[in-house]
Amino acid sequence: MEPKHPEITIVLATGNKDKVRELKPVLEALASGIHVRSLHDLGLDIDVEETEPTLEGNARLKADAIFELVAPRLDWFIALADDTGLEVDALGGAPGVYSARYAPVPEGVARTYEDNVRHLLSEMRGKSKRTARFRTVIAMKGRLPAANGSAVEIEETTDGHIDGLITTEPKGNGGFGYDPVFAPEGMDRTFAQLGIDEKNAISHRGRAVVAAAKRIGEYLSQCGIQ
């Protein structure tokens, strides 16, 4: 009979359902008995303000906040947070850390994906240089049960990126965010025209998640959890 391992939860520090949909399948395949939960699943409602000037800083900020919130509730868990930015060369790397809040909107009005896409295309009007890249940084903070009964502390980051071009108009109905106007390098389709599995196999977030999953897997192996 296989030994029963302590319950371990990976808490996705996001309220973005689209991100959860992309992250969950990769993390659920890590090991048996690993539970992947979003903040909504745990009945938590927190919005961490992204005040850091880098993707790394914002990802750590969110992972730290979720760790403090979850620590009294769960014995063994990993808080996993990400921050993603679109870096457009012709715009000096903008929108970067401001990607989610790029378009100017009136106070009190909710900013939409479409607002950001329209603003980006407006800023890119007439520009021949359309190279860009998506970058995702994932921060992990948590604790796992060591074989000797103590705790293994986790605190680190992984990252992933993909180069591509900004199209002149939106194409495709899939994905989210800037996906309709980002064509990965070497492809004549945008992220929004790819299936979710095809996108995850090459995307910045997919690459960062794979790197994070590898590190988590190494920690689990260290703790004797398969």
Swiss-Prot record:
This is dITP/XTP pyrophosphatase. Pyrophosphatase that catalyzes the hydrolysis of nucleoside triphosphates to their monophosphate derivatives, with a high preference for the non-canonical purine nucleotides XTP (xanthosine triphosphate), dITP (deoxyinosine triphosphate) and ITP. Seems to function as a house-cleaning enzyme that removes non-canonical purine nucleotides from the nucleotide pool, thus preventing their incorporation into DNA/RNA and avoiding chromosomal lesions. Binds 1 Mg(2+) ion per subunit. The active site is at 83 (proton acceptor). Substrate binds at residues 14-19, 84, 176-179, 199, 204-205. Its cofactor is Mg(2+). Homodimer. HAMAP family: Non_canon_purine_NTPase. Keywords: Hydrolase, Magnesium, Metal-binding, Nucleotide metabolism, Nucleotide-binding. Its EC number is 3.6.1.66. One of its GO terms (cellular component) is cytosol. Signal peptide: none annotated. Belongs to the HAM1 NTPase family. It comes from the Bacteria. It catalyses: XTP + H2O = XMP + diphosphate + H(+); dITP + H2O = dIMP + diphosphate + H(+); ITP + H2O = IMP + diphosphate + H(+). GO terms for molecular function: dITP diphosphatase activity; ITP diphosphatase activity; metal ion binding; nucleotide binding; ribonucleoside triphosphate phosphatase activity; XTP diphosphatase activity. Mg(2+) binds at residues 49, 83. One of its GO terms (biological process) is purine nucleoside triphosphate catabolic process. It comes from Chlorobaculum tepidum (strain ATCC 49652 / DSM 12025 / NBRC 103806 / TLS) (Chlorobium tepidum).
